Design a protein with these regions (language model features):
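Conserved lysine of the Walker
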Residues: 97
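N-terminal pre-Walker A segment at the start of P-loop NTPase domains
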Residues: 53-74
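Hydrophobic positions on the alpha1 helix immediately C-terminal to the Walker A/P-loop
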Residues: 100, 104
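Post-Walker A helix-loop "phosphate-sensing" segment adjacent to the P-loop in P-loop NTPases
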Residues: 107-118, 149-151
Length: 411
């Protein structure tokens, strides 16, 4: 029933991991690793492939979501009779929601593999996409497709649901991740039926459900009876654009926000791959620009007893993490960190836009043999429409007027 074909193609690696076979390959595939000092130089093709995939930076949303999911999974492991508490990751487009979901799924998959043993036949994690205009039966078919559950044309929705619930419980699925949840519209009859069907599955499948979608609280998903039930059972994590600066309080000298002097990203294991988290060695390695690769860049103010306010720069920290992971031969360390205000203007603090900008700039630098990322090179790259609408360089009117006024001839 569950396919176990080890042969992976490039097309498979590029596809969304919405079947168990594809998700297992995604989770087991080692994440990209930044070059280490003393390593032999990589070839052009190797470096192009590396920057295409690139490291994943552990943003605050990734760290918080992982902790929440692990807590909910422990809370609901032995719960019976009622639906387990769930979680919704929401935010604007290109803020790393899907990457956050996949990184959490990868981490939970690897943790369960260690706990149960590599030879175990369990399927701990399921990842599904809500199809556009989803009906209840379409959702049921997506659940069946993930595990390769046989479905015939004559089967009713109730029969498919019964087969799905039995298989998911018997094979040990503990975490169900549903992406693009904003596509459900309970205000329509089909959308309401799909929302009710999803609620029914949360009560029949012994797993923790985590959803991700665009600005979910502003959609119809939280309205009506079904929406109220979902909102009453699901916690919310906002995956917002990264601010240029933020303040957090501290009560003890030498302590960070985690309370023990470590960056919050040090509390979790390795991760990698994608546009949202700095996994692997890049999360703890200290860069040559003076900031650690997980972005431990903060300024403290307050009294002599250690209490006060810590000024943190989450966006600058993320830029530092990505810059420290570059594999370019002539790039000047710290140059992108100094451009952090400009990069924040270009991307509006959206992690997806930032990742695409730096990955494209790195690949261009390899192809044109400049081997470095500069401000002019970044200016030459057109980003997604959202980012370009946000960033409109303003030329001072006086300078523009001078440029358009012909020079006077001397007599």
């Amino acid at each position: 029933m569950v396919s176990d074909n080890p042969a992976a193609t490039a097309e498979d690696r590029d596809a969304s991991p919405t079947t168990w076979e594809l998700f297992r390959r995604f989770a087991d595939d080692p994440p990209p690793v930044p070059p280490a000092p003393g390593d032999p130089p990589r070839s052009v093709e190797e470096r192009l492939a590396y920057h295409s995939r690139f490291v994943t930076v552990r943003t605050p949303a990734v760290v918080k979501t992982l902790l929440e999911v692990r807590t909910l999974m422990a809370l609901g492991r032995y719960q019976q009779a009622t639906a387990r508490p769930s979680l919704i990751v929401t935010g604007p487009p290109t803020t790393g929601k899907t990457t956050t979901l996949l990184e959490v799924g990868r981490t939970c998959h690897l943790a369960e593999a260690v706990r149960a043993g590599r030879g175990a036949s369990q399927v701990p994690v399921a990842y599904l996409l809500v199809p556009p205009g989803a009906t209840a039966k379409a959702l049921a078919l997506e659940f069946a497709r993930y595990l390769g559950i046989p479905v015939s044309a004559r089967m009713t929705q109730a029969q498919i649901a019964a087969s799905v619930c039995h298989t998911y419980n018997s094979i040990g699925v503990r975490l169900v991740m549903i992406d693009e949840i904003h596509r459900l519209n309970p205000r329509t009859s089909t959308g309401a039926e799909a929302a009710d069907f999803l609620k029914d599955l949360t009560e029949r499948i012994s797993a923790t459900f985590v959803y991700a979608g665009i600005d979910v609280t502003a959609t119809a998903l939280f309205t009506g009876t079904a929406g109220a039930q979902l909102a009453g059972r699901a916690g919310l994590i906002n995956c917002d654009p990264l601010p240029a600066t933020a303040r957090t309080s501290t009560t003890r000298a030498g302590n960070s926000a985690t309370g023990d002097g470590r960056s919050s990203s040090d509390d979790h294991g390795r991760s990698g791959g994608g546009e949202g988290s700095a996994g692997g060695e890049s999360n703890t390695r200290r860069g040559r620009n003076g900031s650690s690769a997980d972005g431990a860049d903060s300024r403290r103010s307050g009294g002599g007893n250690g209490s006060g306010t810590v000024l943190i720069r989450p966006f600058r920290e993320t830029v530092a993490a990505m810059e420290n992971a570059l594999d370019l031969q002539r790039h000047r360390p710290g140059s992108l960190v100094r451009l952090a205000p400009y990069l924040h203007q270009r991307t509006a603090g959206r992690i997806g836009s930032l990742s695409r900008l730096l990955r494209r700039a790195a690949i261009t630098a390899i192809l044109d043999q400049s081997e470095k990322i500069t401000r002019p090179a970044l200016d030459a790259i057109a980003l997604d429409h959202l980012a370009e609408e946000h960033y409109r360089p303003r030329v001072p009117a006086r300078r523009t007027q001078r440029a358009n006024t012909p020079a006077r001839r001397s007599t």
